[in-house]
């Protein structure tokens, strides 16, 4: 028998990837439901009508009266819970839920739950690779790749989920085996009232967690939990008890656990301090669920990074080009600038700009002054970044990404690196951050 009673009506709100996974989940269980979407032609509409022609679909402005007729609304993460029709439904006593809440009710295997302003996808993928290396039947997804509900299966031994703050808003209690907030920096300020509001959403991941992993360098990642809950930590300093970190010996840095050296960072394919932090976070999470060190370290050595995350593109005339298009907020750009900037002999030429989502760019000024030779700006909020940077380094404004790459190539010197790390979303000029990254790589390849 399903955990959800089937005597009342449900509505799936939003017909993107997660919405379609909800449709499949409810249909498999024979539960009555309808689908609504604020868009006239949502991305999965044709698929829904072809596979589930019996399901009622309403597109366009949300009908509050219709939503109030349901016992439960499954809201997709792309829609704010402050949407007036949703607020009215909640006030009438309609339960507001989502795909992660349903997943948590059904999952039988332990869950590794990962959120954070940055590095979620890299750490999630790493933990998944570590589990595979340990011969675990693992399912990896959530905000990354496969929607969580599509992962559910009886033979799975471990779930590894990347979760966004939007997904966590509709999850009452995840009950993860181990949960982490990797880092917290300003993001999505166009949707939240401020950092405190955003921080609260992120920390919903810890509800019911049996173990937690925290970032020693970021106090905002540490939850208010009972002393009886095991707490592991990671950071770039020397580790102590129940901690992962870096040990330096004879001029060589090692990934380490407590007082034991594990692996020289020189054996990693991923570069930069931010990636060493990602590796340590993955080790902490894997260790918490019992993955053996030999399997985890083997997976780490084989991992070459994800596309558009500080990804090496090519070297030209002694200058390396890196695609960090996934850096859609200030915190991600800071991690790339500081991590890569400290790891090269020369300076960075930074390409930045786009849709800033209401962010404050002033935190970029100091690391840009320290690590960058120049900054090339483009996109809607280029002017805001220019104001924040002031006269820290030379600034160049351009209209297109092709022009940005050409200007960066002229500014860079041998030993430098050109880094696309926009600190902004891409939707003002591109379909998504992936397209921005692909077009950057294409422009780099086309340099004379």
UniProtKB/Swiss-Prot annotation:
Keywords from the UniProt entry: ATP-binding, Cell cycle, Cell division, Cell shape, Cell wall biogenesis/degradation, Cytoplasm, Ligase, Nucleotide-binding, Peptidoglycan synthesis
Residues the record lists as binding ADP: 119-122, 278, 309, 324, 326
Residues that, per the record, bind ATP: 116-122
Coiled coil, from the record: none
Keyword Cytoplasm appears in the UniProt entry: yes
Gene Ontology annotations for the cellular component aspect, listed alphabetically: cytoplasm
Superkingdom of the source species: Bacteria
GO molecular function: ATP binding; UDP-N-acetylmuramoylalanine-D-glutamate ligase activity
Pathway(s) served: Cell wall biogenesis; peptidoglycan biosynthesis
Catalytic activity: UDP-N-acetyl-alpha-D-muramoyl-L-alanine + D-glutamate + ATP = UDP-N-acetyl-alpha-D-muramoyl-L-alanyl-D-glutamate + ADP + phosphate + H(+)
Chief location: cytoplasm
PANTHER family xrefs: UDP-N-ACETYLMURAMOYLALANINE--D-GLUTAMATE LIGASE
Role, per record: Involved in cell wall formation. Catalyzes the addition of D-glutamate to the peptidoglycan precursor UDP-N-acetylmuramoyl-L-alanine (UMA).
Protein name, per record: UDP-N-acetylmuramoylalanine--D-glutamate ligase
